[in-house]
Design a protein with these regions (language model features):
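Glycine-rich phosphate/diphosphate-binding loop of Rossmann-like nucleotide-binding domains
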Residues: 37-39, 44-71, 76-77, 82, ...
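Terminal amphipathic alpha-helical/low-complexity segments used for targeting or macromolecular assembly
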Residues: 1-26, 32, 185-202
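Glycine-rich hexapeptide-repeat left-handed beta-helix
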Residues: 70, 76-77, 82-202
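ABC ATPase A-loop
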Residues: 28, 49, 157
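Short Cys/His-rich Zn2+-coordinating modules
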Residues: 14, 54, 72, 102-103
Length: 202
């Protein structure tokens, strides 16, 4: 879960002396969490909560509002903005306006934005998603037999236990179901049913 008792969290933890904390009264670090040297925690736009045993590694940037779940790791040099990260996740690269549920990994460089990622998902190195159309029109997402108008910014919805290969390109407003194994060159289809395999969804 996402720490149901976050406001009961023992927030007496601190960051390394070389870190920069902006609006530090809105930065809540668990006593058992570690915020490593050179990291920046910017709570100008919302609170930042670093939960029990989480690690924000060297030189990472976290802009609030943000929640880093129990036992999760934010990799060195990562850039996170407006995120909710569940427990036991490993997150690197650039992530914004996105939820990662527990036990999901995006360890390497690549951009994921305006997206919703289930549990036990693994995104291979340099997996990227688009979240804005070139003509700035609203994004439509197919869910089952219906299409939903998701507004100007919408990335991807990825179901539990799905994996992507290295350098996977995910189009604007893409739906990927449960238990998929996605790989191959070029943009993936915008609707990938559960248990699909490969670039052609076979």
């Amino acid at each position: 879960g996402f720490g149901e008792d976050i406001y009961d969290l023992d927030c007496k933890g601190s960051a390394h002396e070389s870190c920069i904390l902006i609006n530090n009264d809105r930065v809540h670090i668990s006593n058992s969490a570690v915020v490593s040297a050179g990291s920046i925690l910017d709570a100008t736009d919302g609170d930042i909560i670093i939960d029990d045993n989480a690690l924000v590694d060297i030189g990472a940037l976290v802009k609030g509002p943000a929640y880093i779940g129990k036992n999760s790791i934010v990799n060195p040099g990562a850039k996170l903005k407006d995120v909710a990260i569940g427990p036991f996740c490993k997150i690197g690269g650039e992530v914004e306006h996105t939820t990662f549920h527990g036990f999901s990994n995006k360890q390497h460089d690549g951009y994921i934005g305006n997206s919703y990622i289930g549990e036990w998902v693994n995104l291979g190195a340099n997996t990227n998603n688009s979240d804005l159309k070139n003509n700035y029109s609203n994004v439509r997402i197919r869910i089952g037999d219906n299409e939903v108008d998701a507004g100007m910014f919408a990335g991807c919805l990825i179901g539990d236990f799905t994996k992507t290969g290295i350098s996977t390109m995910i189009n604007t407003g893409t739906y990927i179901g449960l238990g998929c194994n996605i790989f191959g060159g070029g943009f993936q289809k915008k609707y990938i049913p559960s248990f699909s395999w490969g670039a052609d969804g076979e």
